[in-house]
């Protein structure tokens, strides 16, 4: 029975897809195949298609099968980081003279990749408010090969109607790439809504424990999958076996973790909306969020990420970050522990002076799975 027919239920797929019992010992958890090369049965006689671990490794294969099943795709590819996955994708899709549309609130690392690296390839790019399909359409050119979307976006929690933007992109002959890092496949499945490629930083919710760095691409198009696999092997920025094992462990509990992240975040967002020092709360679960209806349509729940703006400007926002005690001041997101950061000085510093620059008074929360009362109390004392 193939993985996609184990069950239609996400929680069951997360535990069983790609997790075949070890044929030698019966171990229910796939081993960490910490190996670089494989014995051949005669010249070219490969066992299971394995010859060199840059090309393929059984532990990585298990993870890639798991990721494909969870996103409803036919091919998953695991990389050494989310940016390594982005780099492979861009090298596969684009050449000199091509054009890409990216969000006007993209992740700082993605912006840096386009601004400092991709532009040197002779590739053109422009920004658009992807929450507005007409703005995406206006940004298209005859050379556009891809439209890039984050939803929810990092760090402004913007929401893009995936199905609507997919239609706009496809009408122009472009592919739609969706960064699904904030939502995860448990909350949102972009391929089912018309996306061509789903991107993940596995470092975040998929790993879920702040102990691994990784990235992934998932597609349904077999030809595109083969092209990506060729570039993955040619470039070599693959996920190692132990990293693959850590993420595979993480995906098993993804559903229960995301339920708790979302539950805690909803309560925290509600508290922040009523706090006198908070001027704005950015969380798609709030009815007043401009993307709430779209998010409710395409997401199972609203996730664990919140951003908010603080009265008093940049220094006040920094002070809130520094005063937190249960929330750890640090970059990244998606672990079981709650994190707080100042995007303008930390994760999104590379956007300063650009169209993607984030507000100086912005604070970003990655809400963990601790007792929510402790988190609420910590934020209240940090805000003063």
Tell me the role of every PLM-derived stretch.
Residues 115, 124, 145, 322, ...:
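PLP-dependent enzyme catalytic core of the Aspartate aminotransferase-like
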Residues 247-256, 303-311, 364-368:
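Short, well-ordered beta-strand elements within core beta-sheets of diverse protein domains
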Residues 2-7, 11, 58, 270, ...:
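Positively charged, small/polar-rich N-terminal and surface patches that mediate targeting and assembly
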Residues 2-6, 16, 75-277, 282:
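Conserved PLP-enzyme active-site core in the AAT-like
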Residues 37-87, 109-116:
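Conserved N-terminal alpha-helix of the aminotransferase class I/II PLP-enzyme fold
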Residues 235-236, 323-332, 382-384:
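A common structural junction motif
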């Amino acid at each position: 029975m193939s993985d996609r027919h184990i069950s239609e239920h996400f929680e069951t797929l997360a535990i069983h897809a790609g997790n075949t019992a070890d044929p030698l010992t019966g171990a229910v958890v796939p081993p960490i195949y910490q190996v670089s090369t494989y014995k051949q049965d005669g010249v070219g006689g490969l066992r299971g298609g394995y010859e060199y671990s840059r090309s393929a490794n059984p532990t990585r294969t298990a993870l890639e099968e798991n990721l494909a099943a969870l996103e409803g795709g036919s091919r998953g590819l695991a990389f050494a980081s989310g940016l390594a996955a982005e780099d492979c994708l861009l090298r596969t899709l684009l050449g000199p003279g091509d054009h890409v549309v990216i969000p006007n609130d993209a992740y700082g690392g993605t912006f840096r990749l386009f601004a400092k690296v991709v532009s040197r390839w002779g590739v053109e790019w422009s920004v658009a408010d992807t929450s507005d399909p007409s703005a995406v359409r206006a940004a298209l050119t005859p050379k556009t090969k891809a439209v890039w979307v984050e939803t929810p976006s990092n760090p402004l929690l913007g929401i893009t109607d995936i199905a609507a933007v997919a239609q706009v992109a496809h009408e122009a002959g472009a592919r739609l790439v969706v960064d699904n890092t904030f939502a995860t496949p448990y909350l949102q499945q972009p391929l089912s809504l018309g996306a061509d490629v789903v991107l993940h930083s596995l470092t975040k919710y998929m790993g879920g424990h702040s102990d691994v760095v990784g990235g992934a691409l998932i597609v349904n198009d077999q030809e595109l999958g083969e092209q990506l696999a060729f570039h993955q092997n040619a470039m070599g920025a693959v996920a190692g076996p132990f990293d693959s094992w850590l993420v595979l462990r993480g995906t098993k509990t993804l559903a229960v973790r995301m339920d708790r992240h979302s539950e805690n975040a909803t309560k925290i967002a509600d508290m922040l909306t009523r706090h006198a020092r908070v001027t704005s709360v950015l969380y798609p679960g709030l009815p007043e969020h401009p993307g709430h209806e779209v998010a409710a349509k395409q997401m199972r729940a609203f996730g664990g990420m919140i951003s908010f703006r603080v009265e008093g400007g940049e220094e006040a926002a920094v002070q809130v970050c520094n005063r937190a005690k249960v929330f750890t001041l640090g970059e990244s997101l998606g672990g079981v522990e709650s994190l707080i950061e100042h995007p303008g000085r930390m994760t999104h510093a590379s956007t300063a002076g650009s169209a993607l620059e984030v507000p100086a008074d912005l604070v970003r929360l990655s809400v963990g799975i601790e007792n929510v009362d402790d988190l609420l109390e910590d934020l209240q004392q940090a805000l003063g």
